[in-house]
């Protein structure tokens, strides 16, 4: 069936309406999560997702994203183009129906989209509702159609034909400006757009995505013919590999006993390296499932079963009772799991966890077949993988024994560790704050200046271990790490339980110099590798102490960066009698100053640590904190231009 015939099949009557659009402007958070930075970019991704759905359906091969000045953004695809006929229910064009009626779209009609990221007919209308200006161009049936909306989806005039195009030239272009009477005054971040677009291109092999900053004349083009294989190679760049090539599995699972006759498309790419950590990222219909789900369970089911079968058959186990478990297969593993499902079921509105039972069966089946064949064809690599798993198991069992000994008082006594915790009096974890403070002097000032009812202080008096370079056993034996684990109360790694967290704000407070930045990075590396939910749930913050104290007579002001310092100086009438103190360390502030500038919940500035893209975060941590020197050198060279406030 050719494209023209498919275009005619996808028409106005395919658009089904579920409910109206009235609530979006009143309660935008219900639809896009927030009205800040994340919500702003969510608007863009809703439009991009529609274009990606056209690509997954086999009709679009290219998506173009253009960022214009003043936060105007445009998304163009070469898919079929929105239907332009009159909708029988609304008596308006299908384009206007899609863009002004919530839950109106072609995604509810299974004949048009076999898989999509969700009910994305919702997305286009929500973006229109939250835009001050919204324009759409549709190339379809040899015509160029156009419609404009203003002030939250109010049509300026009905859809009209403004030109002719060739019969085979099709697609949709949407251009919008967020409504800043509703959205917070945040800017689209070009780097964020680039990173997310690159991820989409990896997940949809052969799809070309062009991202352009029109004002700065910067153009990035992403197209990966290798798809997930290229993705894993990128994540493993600069790492010492155990498996020289990427193991790849791809297939379509369709068993009427499990899938009701509908296809589940599975792709898995994986490769082992010599690191102690892992990077396992999963997606369902291009949506990152940060909390995993049934497809991840199927992935582990396959690894454990195939590895155990291979080890038993080839007599690689030393005893008959020896078995590889799920925890043993993770060390050094970089893997991307991606499934495409006709009817994905997610846990909650954030779509962080996939719940379809057939996804587990499908992933297990597709991966098992390919992995078993690969191991049998590559016995040396298979042996290296099994040995890696068994070594990981041996280390893990030793760690369990060490923890048990510690709990019985035979091992490390956490109560007598250096960096003694000065706890707060409140028992309510939701309002309790833990300041992890660099050095004794700053720790002393923080203890004296804090609000003792809700603020606890944990001074770091020794060296924090690099969790990227060292084994889990070595990490656990580090006294500073052990103190933090004890203070937080959650346990660590596989024993981590977020419900046992004693503080809902964990605030890293270090000096504003190179050493302070290094300590912050070491702590974040540890949290990311072994307590990642702390970051995912938004519990980790970076304190922002001032860089300058500016005294003019009796007037004292604090500047948190050089620009702020210049602004304060510019408004001072008497510039001759001004004293500027550049803080090199937290210890230079007395308790009152530290409270006023950095710890007072009413006036302080803090940065919340967030993970926008787990795979990118993983690459950055591995590059900066790993063993290999050359990738780190390259990263610093490429990103040095973005560095500020460097002490030389």
From Swiss-Prot:
Top-level class of the enzyme under EC nomenclature: isomerase
One Gene Ontology MF term: ATP binding
Gene Ontology CC annotation, any one: cytoplasm
Annotated positions binding Mg(2+) 2: 511, 513
Entry's EC annotation: 5.6.2.2
Compartment(s) where it occurs, according to its Swiss-Prot or TrEMBL record: Cytoplasm
Pfam families: DNA_gyraseB (PF00204), DNA_gyraseB_C (PF00986), HATPase_c (PF02518), Toprim (PF01751)
Residues reported to bind Mg(2+) 1: 438, 511
Record GO biological process: DNA topological change; DNA-templated DNA replication
Site (Interaction with DNA): 463, 466
Reaction catalyzed: ATP-dependent breakage, passage and rejoining of double-stranded DNA
Domain of life: Bacteria
Cofactor notes: Binds two Mg(2+) per subunit. The magnesium ions form salt bridges with both the protein and the DNA. Can also accept other divalent metal cations, such as Mn(2+) or Ca(2+).
Signal peptide: none
Domain Toprim: 432-546
Purpose of the protein: A type II topoisomerase that negatively supercoils closed circular double-stranded (ds) DNA in an ATP-dependent manner to modulate DNA topology and maintain chromosomes in an underwound state. Negative supercoiling favors strand separation, and DNA replication, transcription, recombination and repair, all of which involve strand separation. Also able to catalyze the interconversion of other topological isomers of dsDNA rings, including catenanes and knotted rings. Type II topoisomerases break and join 2 DNA strands simultaneously in an ATP-dependent manner.
Family: Belongs to the type II topoisomerase GyrB family.
Extra facts: Few gyrases are as efficient as E.coli at forming negative supercoils. Not all organisms have 2 type II topoisomerases; in organisms with a single type II topoisomerase this enzyme also has to decatenate newly replicated chromosomes.
Protein name: DNA gyrase subunit B
The species this protein was found in: Metamycoplasma hominis (strain ATCC 23114 / DSM 25592 / NBRC 14850 / NCTC 10111 / PG21)
């Amino acid at each position: 069936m050719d494209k023209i015939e498919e275009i005619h099949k996808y028409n106005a009557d395919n658009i089904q309406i579920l409910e109206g659009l009235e609530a979006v402007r009143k309660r935008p958070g219900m639809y896009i999560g927030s009205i800040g930075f994340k919500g702003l970019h969510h608007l863009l991704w809703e439009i991009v997702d529609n274009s990606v759905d056209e690509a997954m359906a086999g009709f679009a091969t290219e998506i173009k994203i253009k960022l214009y000045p003043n936060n105007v953004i445009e998304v163009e695809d070469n898919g079929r183009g929105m239907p332009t006929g009159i909708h029988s229910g609304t008596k308006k064009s299908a384009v206007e129906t899609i863009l002004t009626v919530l839950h109106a779209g072609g995604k509810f009609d299974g004949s048009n989209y076999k898989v999509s990221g969700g009910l994305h007919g919702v997305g286009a209308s929500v973006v229109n509702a939250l835009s001050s200006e919204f324009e759409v161009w549709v190339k379809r049936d040899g015509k160029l159609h156009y419609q404009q909306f203003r002030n939250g989806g109010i049509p300026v005039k009905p859809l009209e034909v403004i030109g002719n195009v060739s019969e085979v030239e099709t697609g949709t272009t949407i251009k919008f400006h967020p409504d800043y009477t509703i959205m917070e005054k945040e800017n689209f971040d070009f780097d964020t757009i680039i990173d997310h677009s690159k991820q989409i291109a990896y997940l949809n092999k052969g799809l070309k995505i062009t991202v352009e900053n029109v004002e700065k004349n910067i153009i990035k083009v992403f197209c990966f013919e290798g798809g997930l294989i290229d993705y894993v190679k990128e994540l493993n760049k600069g790492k010492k590999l155990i498996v020289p090539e990427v193991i790849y599995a791809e297939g379509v699972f369709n068993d009427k006993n499990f899938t009701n006759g509908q296809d589940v498309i599975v792709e898995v790419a994986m490769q082992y390296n010599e690191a102690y950590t892992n990077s396992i990222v999963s997606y369902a219909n291009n949506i990152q499932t940060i909390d995993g789900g049934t497809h991840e369970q199927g992935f582990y089911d396959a690894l454990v079963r195939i590895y155990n079968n291979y080890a038993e058959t080839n007599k690689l186990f030393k005893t008959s009772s020896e078995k590889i478990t799920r925890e043993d297969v993770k060390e050094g593993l970089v893997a991307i799991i991606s499934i495409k499902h006709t009817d994905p079921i997610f846990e909650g509105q954030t779509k962080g966890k996939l719940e379809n039972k057939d996804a587990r069966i499908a992933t297990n089946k597709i991966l098992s077949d390919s992995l078993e064949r690969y191991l049998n064809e590559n016995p040396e690599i298979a042996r290296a993988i099994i040995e890696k798993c068994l070594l990981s198991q041996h280390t893990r069992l030793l760690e369990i024994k060490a923890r048990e000994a510690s709990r019985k008082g035979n091992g490390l006594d956490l109560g007598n560790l250096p960096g003694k915790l000065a706890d707060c009096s409140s028992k309510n974890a939701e309002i309790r704050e833990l300041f992890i403070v660099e050095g004794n002097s700053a720790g002393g000032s923080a203890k004296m200046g804090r609000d003792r009812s809700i603020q606890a202080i944990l001074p770091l008096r020794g060296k924090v271990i690099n969790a990227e370079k060292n084994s889990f056993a070595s990490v656990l034996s580090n006294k500073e790490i052990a103190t933090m684990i004890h203070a937080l109360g959650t346990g660590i790694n596989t024993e981590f339980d977020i419900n046992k967290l004693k503080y809902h704000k964990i605030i890293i407070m270090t000096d504003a110099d190179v050493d302070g930045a290094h300590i912050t990075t070491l702590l974040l590396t540890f949290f990311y590798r072994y307590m990642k939910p702390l970051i995912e749930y938004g519990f980790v913050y970076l304190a922002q102490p001032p860089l300058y104290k500016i005294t003019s007579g009796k007037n004292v002001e604090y500047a948190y960066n050089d620009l702020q310092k210049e602004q304060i100086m510019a408004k001072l009438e008497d510039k001759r009698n001004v004293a500027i103190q550049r803080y090199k360390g937290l210890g230079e502030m007395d308790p009152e100053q530290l409270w006023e500038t950095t710890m007072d919940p009413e006036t302080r500035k803090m940065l919340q640590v967030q993970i926008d893209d787990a795979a990118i975060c993983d690459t950055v941590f591995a590059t900066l904190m790993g063993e290999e020197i050359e990738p780190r050198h390259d990263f610093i060279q490429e990103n040095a231009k973005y560095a500020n406030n460097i002490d030389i």
